[in-house]
Structure formats: C-alpha cells, structure tokens
C-alpha cells in the first residue's frame, strides 16, 4: 500500500498538460528530467542492445511508446549470440516478459529484474539457465549489469507500470541495432538465422513505436501473426511463480 501511495503522490504533482509532453517528444529523444515523474505508473517497454551496450526504456504516451531514457550497460558477458546453457557465461537474446514476481528490490546486486530466461523459445531449444537479470553493481556473469543509479530509475518505472496494472513488461534483447547495414555486417555469423527471427520485432517498433506481439511457432519467433491454438505466447509460457533472482 505504501508503494502504491507513493506512485499516486508522484502522479498528482502539478505539471504541464500531457498533450504538451506528447507534442514535444519523439521516440528517439529522451524525455526531459523534469517531466519524467509525471509519467510514473505508465506502461513501459525495454530494448537492450548488446553491441552498443545500451538499454533503452520507453514509456507509453498516447497510443505509442516514447524514449524515456537510454542507459549505459556497465557489463554483460559472453559476446554476441543467445544464452544456451547454464555456465556458458552468455547473456540472453530474444523476447522476454517481466511480471511483479520477478522484481527483487533487495538483491545483493543492489536491485534486480529477472528477465524470465528461459522463455518458451529457449525451452523449445533445450536452453537452460537461471538468475538472468538486469541489475546494479556493474558486475556480470551472464546478466546485464547497470550502474546503481541506472537500475534505480529503471526499477522504479518498471515497478510503477506493474503496480498500476500493466500485466507484464516486455524486454526485447538484440545483439545490436538491427539495421539492414548491421545485419549485412553480421550475415556470416553462426547466429545469423536466429537474428533474422528477431529483426521483424525490431523493425516493427521502429515503424510503429509499439512493442511487437511475439509468438513461438514450431520453435521459432514469429512477430505479429494471428494466433492459433498451436501457438505458444512467451508470456503465457512462463514457469515463474516466485522471484528467481539473486
């Protein structure tokens, strides 16, 4: 109740009109610091880019998602490519969902958000691992480590969104910004076929500023396709009932 009251108090701070925020911002320009608190509790969306060492946090404004801020990733491990097994020291790539049970405010790495690895895609391929997180302390063994100041703000907005009714926060993790030029640069990579499954999700958000709807069909990621009874959506396939975090 105290947490909910805090978010409500933040949202009631006198401020400029919401329409003004919409007209003065774009999906690629971070929102001014003085306006951030006005958006506390709004739905959010996360994109991570390994090669650029960047976490982008977006907030819903009207019908689309705008860039709240970009945060430098202190550290991740294992280079490009998806995590496949416990102990390979790699950080995951793919599409994940975070629910309230995956938040750890008292982590030994300051604060932590369990991304939900392995998801339905990972399990379909026999990938395994646990405790894969976005956390503070700038130390990583398969996780995405942020500065404490960075994870503080990310954690605050993710918590606020979930407290105010967002069922889960989507986290899209890419090896790099999936432009055509970057895809061509990596076309001979061992992981090229896997990355081609991720690119439609990246492209969809670039074009619409809305998170992609991601499903798994025959062990492959499929973006924005009509669902049938055979399709497993990652958020429905989560086997987390308690927070699996450090």
Give residue ranges: language-model regions.
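Exported/periplasmic cell-wall-interacting domains
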Residues: 87-244
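Sec-dependent N-terminal signal peptides
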Residues: 6-11
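Positively charged n-region of N-terminal signal peptides that target proteins for export
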Residues: 1-4
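Short Gly/aromatic-enriched secondary-structure transition segments
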Residues: 61-76
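N-terminal post-signal-peptidase region of extra-cytosolic proteins
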Residues: 28-45, 57-58, 75-87, 91-100, ...
């Amino acid at each position: 109740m105290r947490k909910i009251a805090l978010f409500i108090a933040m949202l009631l701070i006198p401020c400029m009109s919401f329409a003004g925020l919409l007209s003065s911002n774009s999906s690629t320009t971070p929102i001014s610091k003085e306006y951030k608190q006005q958006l506390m509790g709004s739905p959010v969306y996360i994109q991570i880019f390994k090669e650029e060492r960047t976490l982008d946090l977006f907030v819903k404004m009207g019908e689309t998602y705008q860039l709240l801020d970009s945060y430098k990733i202190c550290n991740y491990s294992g280079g490009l490519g998806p995590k496949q097994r416990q102990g390979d020291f790699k950080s995951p790539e793919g599409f994940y969902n975070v629910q309230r049970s995956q938040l750890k405010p008292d982590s030994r790495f300051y604060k932590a958000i369990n991304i939900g690895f392995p998801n339905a895609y990972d399990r379909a391929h026999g990938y395994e691992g646990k405790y894969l997180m976005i956390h503070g302390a700038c130390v990583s063994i398969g996780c995405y480590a942020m500065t404490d100041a960075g994870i503080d703000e990310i954690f605050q907005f993710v918590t606020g969104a979930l407290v105010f009714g967002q069922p889960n926060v989507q986290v899209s993790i890419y090896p790099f910004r999936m432009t055509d030029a970057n895809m061509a640069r990596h076309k001979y990579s061992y992981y090229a076929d896997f990355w081609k499954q991720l690119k439609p999700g990246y492209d969809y958000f670039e074009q619409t500023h809305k998170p992609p709807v991601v499903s798994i069909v025959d062990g492959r990621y499929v973006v924005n396709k009509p669902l049938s009874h055979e399709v497993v959506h990652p958020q429905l396939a989560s086997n987390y009932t308690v927070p699996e975090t450090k």
